[in-house]
């Protein structure tokens, strides 16, 4: 600041000191002896955003699978056409421990109210499930500025597993993802605008790409009425990649209503879109240690 410009009245803002949290990853033993699950993470707002996404999709119940290496959240949207699978790898958090593979069922509305009260003053979330209280999941939020801990005890259940939902995890296996013939990236704003605009005219849109170095093409045509073509000519600007042979055409028809609702629900800025030959679509996004996948099935639209 120049010497001839005087600071206004009042004290200068106090600079916040953020603790340096070490990310130790997966532990061989829990910090608390009674813990079946311990999860400590220095980015609580990631969970808040995840449950905002579940709320936007009007998901009801959420299945939580804990394994010795990761924690995964499974749910469906209200239309039952889209399946959400969100995974956090234990090696990417401050510390993680799970004794074995087990499932918990939680009510989205109940947990959502808890996360609504969490703001940036909380720098760490700890989730604990104990052997002596199997019906309870503990959420501990820590504000280091004033040395405050807020603990919520949420009732959980041993859920009835939704096998169709769990089966969707095969769609996002590392081996399966390598074989998707078409993928590109949109910002959430681009995705929302494209499908919102299209919804004014048609229920279905065609996604098409020729083999080789050709544009991504979205279009619809109503005979004797109106047609529309949206071309993405620079593949690098949307990170467009494909494995379509030069002599072939990749083409699928997608129901706009489902994609429009997903676009409106998104909580990340960047979305990776993958198309399968049978018309299934996968929407991928990342939030720090969280990988968020939403699968929309063509045979359900």
From Swiss-Prot:
Classification via SUPFAM superfamilies: DNA clamp (SSF55979)
A biological process from GO: symbiont-mediated suppression of host cytoplasmic pattern recognition receptor signaling pathway via inhibition of IRF3 activity
InterPro entries membership: DNA_clamp_sf (IPR046938)
Keywords: Host-virus interaction, Inhibition of host innate immune response by virus, Inhibition of host IRF3 by virus, Inhibition of host RLR pathway by virus, Late protein, Viral immunoevasion
Iron-sulfur in keyword set: no
Swiss-Prot/TrEMBL induction comment: Expressed in the late phase of the viral replicative cycle.
Subunit (UniProt): Interacts with host IRF3.
Biological function: Plays a role in the inhibition of host innate immune system by acting as a negatively regulator of type I interferon production. Mechanistically, interacts with and prevents host IRF3 nuclear localization to inhibit its transcriptional activity.
Protein name per Swiss-Prot or TrEMBL: Uncharacterized protein E301R
Organism: African swine fever virus (isolate Warthog/Namibia/Wart80/1980)
